[in-house]
Amino acid sequence: MLSERMLTTVVRAMTDKTLTLHPVPEDALPDPVPGRPYTLYVHVPFCERLCPYCSFNRFPYREQRARDYFQALRQEMRMLAAQGYDFESVYVGGGTPTVDIDELCETIDLARDLFHVKEVNSETNPNHLIPEYLDKLHGRIQRLSVGVQSFDDGLLRQMDRYQKYGSGEEIFERIGEAAPYFESLNVDMIFNFPTQTEDILISDCEKIALCGCHQTTFSPLYQSHATTRKMEQVLGRMDYDKERRFYHILDEILAGGDAPFFERRT
């Protein structure tokens, strides 16, 4: 147990160091390598409200700031096309990419005009699974990933997501209604919340199997230097021994046995 905790600490420290970004002197990307496939990642860093556990690059949504940002994204896409880059796959992450649905659609349409795009992937939140948005995303996005995190109302309240995105039951119903609009609808979940019990974890797995999604991704709750204090105030202190135990429970329920709910990919 002690050796595992030490290894976890070392790996997390190395990851933090590796992922620290520094300015580069170049003012343009290197030219594309002929014959090499490329994927375009588009980051939309805006959220309507910021979750206390999230350590990704994100900012509170302001309409004009977001529109200026999307315009800059599209200009950079034109620069990439002029430089000779081509992309068959586009992934839009955040933040909340659907925070300004019309700007997102315009950006995706431009990507398809500039490049030979075969597939677009995007993230979203449950409150954007509404007919108006789904109609606009249908055909533009093939694979949608919905940040659910948990169907448990108690955990949703702790995460400050209950009022923003609805109850677990409401989210469950929205996923079922949204799934037919996409080739693949993924549900993003988090495990190892300090107050999460095995019963809550198992209940989340059962709801995933029944909600109509095509796949699911479970990630352990990640604590960064930027979020540690806020997370401990709001959610409590993390237990990495429980994280390991919960991982094995998830692996057995979702991908183990003779009739697994999902095919294990990673």
What are these regions (language model features)?
Residues 39, 52, 93:
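Divalent metal-dependent hydrolysis catalytic cores, especially in the metallo-beta-lactamase
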